[in-house]
Structures are given as structure tokens and as C-alpha cells.
């Protein structure tokens, strides 16, 4: 089962990735993890990637693709994998297709967890942190006993600047610009599956498994 998992910030993609990896015993392959491993192991591509990152530059596609290829060629991917955070552009998707073909693999499905924009903004802007003890709350999912006050120490709760509505809007705008061409790309290949991410975690997971033709339990 070779799956690409997509979803905007706030869609719960990380949670679903953990559940899929646990249920089907496949490796979770994220771009960040791949870069960190390649740099730690001091592979040739890892050294190249580190040089660009240290200079504050984007890592070129050819280096990224090379690191992805090295990871997908490892033995633990022969029985399936969950790809997360790559590809981000159509040229990267084309390169991934070619890489998978060379390795005798192919994507079985592209799962996109969809949540309406306003709901995503509610999720992204709902975090509150205690100024005194650092406890974290969420106004929707884990509200404090008393609004604005920490339930542990009574300290004042505040919203971090990177949890503001403006920041959330910008993050979602960037994501939409990046991924819309990818959605059309995978729709044309007949692999795209859109999942309703407004449901509870278990229902979302069940729908993902159904889209993959697998049992959730």
C-alpha cells in the first residue's frame, strides 16, 4: 500500500498519518525526516542539502528527489509506505512518478483530507498558552475551565502571534496555491481521493481506510 497523504494546516493530517502507520505497519516518510536523516548520516546528498539550508536557500528539486529516491529504495518500503510533505509541485510529482517507476513501485492512492477554510482557521487560531506555567489549551478541543485563565495555576492565557488569524490565512493561501495544481494532476491520473476531515478522528480514519480498500480495524 503506497499512499501519498495531503491536507492543509489544521486538517489533522499528522494524527491520521500516525494512525495509518500504526494500523498497517508501513514507514511514515516525511520530507523533514528524510532531510534530517540524510544530513545526520552525512550522505553526499545530505551534505548538499545542508549547504543550501545553512545558506538559507531552498534545496533544489534534484537534491530533494535524490534524497526521496534513497529513502524509497530502502527495504522497509517494499511492503508499502506513507509519503507526507512531498511532492509539493507538479514537476516534483513528475519526478516522483519517474523515481517510483525506476524502483518498480507506484502510488496506489493520493488521500486529501479536506476541511472548509473557516473551520481550519478556527482550529489554527484556537490555541491558548498560559503565561505563567506554559500549559496549552485550545478553545475548541481543550478549553480551560474558566475562559482566559489557566486551570492549573490560574495564570493568564494568551494567543501567540503565529496563531493569529492573519498568519492562518497566509498559511492556507500558500497551501492552496501550491496544492491545487497537484490535485488536478492526481485527479487526471485517477488516484485522487478526497476525505471529509470535519468528522471526528475515528470517522476520518475509517473513510481513509475505505478509500484504500482496507479495514480500519
Swiss-Prot record:
Enzyme class: transferase
GO molecular function terms listed in the Swiss-Prot or TrEMBL record: adenylate kinase activity; ATP binding; zinc ion binding
Pathway membership: Purine metabolism; AMP biosynthesis via salvage pathway; AMP from ADP: step 1/1
InterPro entries: Adenyl_kin_sub, Adenylat/UMP-CMP_kin, Adenylat_kinase_CS, Adenylate_kinase_lid-dom, P-loop_NTPase
GO CC, alphabetical: cytoplasm
NMP as annotated region, ranges: 30-59
Residue positions binding Zn(2+): 130, 133, 150, 153
Domain of life where this protein originates: Bacteria
EC number: 2.7.4.3
Alphabetized UniProt keyword annotations: ATP-binding, Cytoplasm, Kinase, Metal-binding, Nucleotide biosynthesis, Nucleotide-binding, Transferase, Zinc
Primary localization class, coarse: cytoplasm
Family: Belongs to the adenylate kinase family.
Oligomer status and interactors: Monomer.
Function: Catalyzes the reversible transfer of the terminal phosphate group between ATP and AMP. Plays an important role in cellular energy homeostasis and in adenine nucleotide metabolism.
Name the UniProt record assigns to this protein: Adenylate kinase
Gene for this chain: adk
Amino acid at each position: 500500500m503506497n499512499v501519498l497523504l495531503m491536507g492543509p494546516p489544521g486538517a489533522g493530517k499528522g494524527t491520521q498519518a500516525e494512525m495509518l502507520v500504526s494500523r498497517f505497519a508501513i514507514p511514515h516518510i516525511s520530507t523533514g525526516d528524510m532531510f534530517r536523516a540524510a544530513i545526520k548520516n552525512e550522505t553526499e546528498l545530505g551534505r548538499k542539502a545542508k549547504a543550501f539550508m545553512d545558506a538559507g536557500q531552498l534545496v533544489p528539486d534534484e537534491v530533494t528527489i535524490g534524497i526521496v529516491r534513497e529513502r524509497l529504495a530502502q527495504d522497509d518500503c517494499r511492503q508499502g509506505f506513507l509519503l507526507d510533505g512531498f511532492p509539493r509541485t507538479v514537476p516534483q510529482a513528475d519526478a516522483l512518478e519517474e523515481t517510483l517507476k525506476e524502483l518498480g513501485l507506484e502510488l496506489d492512492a493520493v488521500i486529501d483530507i479536506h476541511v472548509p477554510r473557516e473551520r481550519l482557521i478556527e482550529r489554527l487560531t484556537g490555541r491558548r498558552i498560559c503565561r505563567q506555567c506554559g500549559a496549552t489549551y485550545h478553545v475548541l478541543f481543550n478549553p480551560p475551565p474558566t475562559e482566559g485563565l489557566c486551570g492549573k495555576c490560574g495564570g493568564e492565557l494568551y494567543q501567540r502571534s503565529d496563531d493569529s488569524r492573519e498568519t492562518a490565512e497566509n498559511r492556507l493561501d500558500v497551501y492552496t496555491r501550491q496544492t491545487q495544481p497537484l490535485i488536478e494532476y492526481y485527479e487526471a491520473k485517477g488516484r485522487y481521493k478526497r476525505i471529509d476531515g470535519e468528522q471526528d478522528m475515528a470517522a476520518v480514519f475509517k473513510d481513509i481506510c475505505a478509500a484504500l480498500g482496507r479495514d480500519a480495524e
